[in-house]
């Protein structure tokens, strides 16, 4: 079990201008034990410079751009650094790390929070939305992971989704890429066993992205999902940090996510560190024999009814 320390770290967060990424940044720059108790350096990354500046204002700490930090003579006072970078471009990620090395800011933890979903039926998606799903949800993570490992970053944190365990209608632009993240994590754990590699599967949490998703989400998708009571981004973040401190590296943030993960073990998934692993493996086997087949028949019937109602309109 590899330890987890929230202090004295250099932490890079992609997708740090909003949502869960911003919440992590806010947590990691706080002086919980009095002024000066926190010695973290936090770098938030996003494509939009203006969003990063606004995020710094919401976090409540004076942020400094990475370009300015490189030439800053009073670096010890700086906790929060921001940098505009399109992490879907490998060259731009590599260039960012050159600046980090020059600034003596090689990360000890990298949080790959960038991502987003546009829930629609497959044929309703535009070519741009399809490509955006690939670049935002996979390319951003694979580029950042590749460059991070080249610089011997000791802890990588990937962010997948509960739909990686159970992809269903309406998530064609999102779920396949989040499943790809899970596959990538399994391979990297084999190739880089000395590196701590965490994969988080968050449930719904309140964010700008969550509100936008509900605008385009098909009715059948909402029906299968059922009613949702999203937690705050801070609650989701604290659950993840608590799990990390326990040494867990396959992390869900609610009971539904844990049950879905229990039902989807399979090859390369038995050496992972998850909550109540042995019990989840047994429970998952029982659910796959009993409950899952019945539930999938119900889903099939829901989709059939939805299609029939749609055709009669």
Curated annotation (Swiss-Prot):
Q: Where does motif GXSXG map?
A: 15-19
For binding NADPH, which residues are annotated in this chain's numbering? Answer: 15, 17, 19, 47, 51, 86
Residues that bind NADP(+), according to the entry? 12, 20, 86, 174, 178, 207
User: What keywords is this UniProt entry annotated with?
Assistant: Endoplasmic reticulum, Lipid metabolism, Membrane, NADP, Nucleotide-binding, Oxidoreductase, Sphingolipid metabolism, Transmembrane, Transmembrane helix
Q: Identify the metabolic or biological route this protein is part of.
A: Lipid metabolism; sphingolipid metabolism
SUPFAM superfamilies per the record?
Answer: NAD(P)-binding Rossmann-fold domains
Q: Where located? A: Endoplasmic reticulum membrane
Catalyzed reactions per annotation: sphinganine + NADP(+) = 3-oxosphinganine + NADPH + H(+)
Coiled-coil regions listed in the entry: none
Keyword Lipid metabolism belongs to the record: yes
Give the enzyme's main class according to its UniProt record, as a single word: oxidoreductase
What membrane topology is given? Single-pass membrane protein
Query: What's the EC number here?
Result: 1.1.1.102
Family that this chain belongs to? Belongs to the short-chain dehydrogenases/reductases (SDR) family.
User: Cross-referenced PANTHER family, in alphabetical order?
Assistant: 3-KETODIHYDROSPHINGOSINE REDUCTASE (PTHR43550:SF3)
- This chain's protein is named 3-ketodihydrosphingosine reductase TSC10
Species assigned in the record:
Kluyveromyces lactis (strain ATCC 8585 / CBS 2359 / DSM 70799 / NBRC 1267 / NRRL Y-1140 / WM37)
Upper classification of the source organism reads: Eukaryota, Fungi, Dikarya, Ascomycota, Saccharomycotina
């Amino acid at each position: 079990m590899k330890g987890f320390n929230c202090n004295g770290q250099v932490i890079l967060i992609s997708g740090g201008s909003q949502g869960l990424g911003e919440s992590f940044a806010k947590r990691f720059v706080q002086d919980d034990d009095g002024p000066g108790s926190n010695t973290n350096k936090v770098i938030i990354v996003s494509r939009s410079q203006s969003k990063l500046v606004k995020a710094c204002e919401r976090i409540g700490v004076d942020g400094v751009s990475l370009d300015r930090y490189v030439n800053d003579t009073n670096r010890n006072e700086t906790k929060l650094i921001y940098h505009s970078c399109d992490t879907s471009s490998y060259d731009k990620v590599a260039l960012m790390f050159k600046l980090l090395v020059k600034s003596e800011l090689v990360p000890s933890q990298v949080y790959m929070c960038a991502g987003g979903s546009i829930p629609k039926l497959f044929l309703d998606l535009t070519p741009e939305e399809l490509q955006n799903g690939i670049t935002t949800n996979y390319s951003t993570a694979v580029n950042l992971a590749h460059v991070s490992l080249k610089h011997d970053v000791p802890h990588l944190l990937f962010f997948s989704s509960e739909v990686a365990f159970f992809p269903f209608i309406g998530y064609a632009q999102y779920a396949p890429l989040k499943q790809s993240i899970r596959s990538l994590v399994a391979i990297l754990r084999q190739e880089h066993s000395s590196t701590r590699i965490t994969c988080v599967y968050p449930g719904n949490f309140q964010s700008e992205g969550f509100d936008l998703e509900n605008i385009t989400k098909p009715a059948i998708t909402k029906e299968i999902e059922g009613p949702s009571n999203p937690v705050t981004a801070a609650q989701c973040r604290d659950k993840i940090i608590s799990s990390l401190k326990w040494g867990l590296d396959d992390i869900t943030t609610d009971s539904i996510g844990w049950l879905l993960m229990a039902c989807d073990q399979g090859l390369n998934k038995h050496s992972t560190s998850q909550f109540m692993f042995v019990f989840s493996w047994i429970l998952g086997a029982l659910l796959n024999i009993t409950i899952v087949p019945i539930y999938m028949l119900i889903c099939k019937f829901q989709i059939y009814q939805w299609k029939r109602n749609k055709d009669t309109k």
